[in-house]
UniProtKB/Swiss-Prot annotation:
Summary of the function given for this chain in its UniProt record: Aminotransferase that catalyzes the conversion of aromatic amino acids and 2-oxoglutarate into corresponding aromatic oxo acids and L-glutamate.
Gene Ontology biological process terms from the UniProt entry: biosynthetic process
Family assignment from sequence similarity: Belongs to the class-II pyridoxal-phosphate-dependent aminotransferase family.
Key words, A-Z: Aminotransferase, Pyridoxal phosphate, Transferase
Enzyme Commission number(s) of this protein: 2.6.1.57
Catalytic activity: an aromatic L-alpha-amino acid + 2-oxoglutarate = an aromatic oxo-acid + L-glutamate
Protein name: Aromatic amino acid aminotransferase
Enzyme kind, highest EC tier: transferase
Cofactor(s) required for function per UniProt: pyridoxal 5'-phosphate
């Protein structure tokens, strides 16, 4: 069988491990709250039409999103999660011999998206604090670059790109180069300096902003996200999309979630408070913890990552391990903030001086 060698060599996306029956899953940055009753009812009302294809164009949801963001409806594109939209946009601009530039470590799907499009990944190392090095990212752009991905806040390390940093970056980027601003965790951000991409669209005709209903809105199982950007770019993404990939269940759940947004954002605020409490506790233990602005925190466990992951697992906590780099701990239910702190206290005490995960002083 003549398979593309670069595809064969590319690891498949690795989902966060499923927790054992009595364990707690803190590996996939899922919203710990169950769906609202109004959302469940909206989804249930679609089940009688499972024999029919979905309204994948989603005019009602696109209208709602366009209204709330102050853009034209043709500047909104729906997809089965923001990662599907990223795939479409990259396929629309990049192919063999082209480059896609992004920071690393970042979202684990980026390398595969570039490879499937036939393009080459150019990975720019993060700063020591886990944030994007935007001057280095701009310097990595060449004549072969077709897209740059900026992940803010950065998954899995946590820091945001500030509005000032992004403005300086965009001033260095060629106007015909597509910039993809991945804002999957935008609703969790509490740092007022963080960039907010959608108001910048009128200033940057080469910018597309991606959002999702998976995280803050708790619709991870239904797979729905959206892109906001220039109509011509999104038309190209639609041409690169798999047909009928957005289900009616996902669409009506998103609409119902927007109607119940106040209640959902109260949940988000509680998760952000738990996140801050978890980070502060880890810092008090002596860990060097990057800025955390999502629904997770990052521990730079380095070569001790496998042992650290095993220690969390032994305590009934399934976390996301990135071999030889670090561990991402999702913020779960209220009662499970203390349990990661208990495990990390023992781990932190064993770190040698000079370890990247150990706070100086």
């Amino acid at each position: 069988m003549r398979l593309r060698p670069e595809i064969v060599a590319t690891p498949a996306y690795r989902q966060g491990r499923t927790a054992a029956a009595d364990d707690f899953k803190l590996s996939s940055n899922e919203n710990p709250y169950p769906p609202l009753a109004s959302v469940v009812a909206a989804v249930g009302a679609t089940l009688g039409g499972l024999n029919r294809y979905p309204d994948a164009g989603g005019a009602d949801l696109r209208d709602k999103l366009a209204e709330r963001h102050g853009v034209d409806v043709d500047q909104v594109h729906l997809g089965s999660g923001s990662v599907a939209l990223l795939a479409q946009l990259i396929r629309a601009v990049a192919g063999a011999g082209d480059e896609v530039v992004y920071s690393w470590r970042s979202f684990e799907a980026y390398p595969g998206l570039a490879t499937v499009a036939g393009a080459t990944s150019v990975q720019v190392p993060n700063r020591a604090d886990g944030g994007h090095d935007l001057p280095a990212l701009a310097a990595a752009i060449t004549d072969r670059t077709r897209a740059v991905i900026v992940c803010t806040l950065n998954n899995p390390t946590g820091p945001v790109v500030t509005a000032a940093e992004f403005a300086s970056f965009m001033a260095e980027v060629p106007g015909d180069l597509l910039v993809l601003l991945d804002e999957a965790y935008h609703e969790f951000e509490t740092d007022e300096a963080a960039v907010n991409g959608i108001p910048l669209l009128s200033r940057h005709p080469n910018l597309v902003v991606l959002r999702t209903f998976s995280k803050a809105y708790g619709l991870a199982a239904l797979r729905i996200g959206y892109a906001v950007g220039p109509a011509a770019v999104l038309d190209a993404a639609r041409s690169a999309a798999l047909p009928l990939s957005v289900t009616d269940a996902a669409r009506v759940a998103a609409l119902a979630s927007i109607e119940a947004e106040d209640e959902l954002m109260e949940r988000v605020a509680r998760i952000a408070m738990r996140r801050d409490r978890l980070r502060e506790a880890l810092i008090e233990q002596g860990w060097s913890v990057p800025q955390a602005q999502g629904n997770f925190v990052w521990l730079a466990t380095g070569e001790e990552t496998a042992a650290a992951s095993d220690a969390f697992s032994a305590a009934g906590l399934t976390v996301r391990a990135f071999p030889s780099e670090g561990i991402r701990i999702s913020v779960g239910e209220h009662e499970y903030v203390e349990r990661p702190v208990e495990v990390s206290a023992d781990l932190g005490g064993k770190l040698p001086n000079g370890h990247p995960g150990k706070r100086l002083g």
